[in-house]
């Protein structure tokens, strides 16, 4: 059994549940698990980068929103936004209510807000330019056309326990849902700790060189 594949994950959920009458519900449990993971987990493998050309005077820029198996790219949360000028400018976030009362003038964009599926620049650029977006994208949902994804490959146990937790309402007390919830929470905590270590270098004590 390859737990890092859609078929392997379904088989593992089936074995853990130990109930043949729920086999047709397993894809639903996995879909619900993906919704949970999109809400609760942020990993480096969920990060994407995109470059967008912006015309002079343009304020609204569409966010990535592709929902196609094998080419899934749906924006969830901004990590970094850079206007490529000389020097480049890191844009800061502005709440939509402040953007609504901001005077529309052209110049060098320094801020942005997000409304719906678009980001809006403040100020509107006075010349053509380029934006570089770094963002968290949705986990590509597993299916026959999408047999794996980076999150499943990186932490299949997290995927498995999330699916088992979502199966809870269907088991009607016949499965150890509380235990699976604990396993899911523990796996999520380990992922968060691993991500933290990867992003921030810890202080390393260096021994002095011994001269001979």
Task: Enumerate the predicted regions with their spans.
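Glycine-enriched, solvent-exposed interface loops adjoining structured elements
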Residues: 1-212
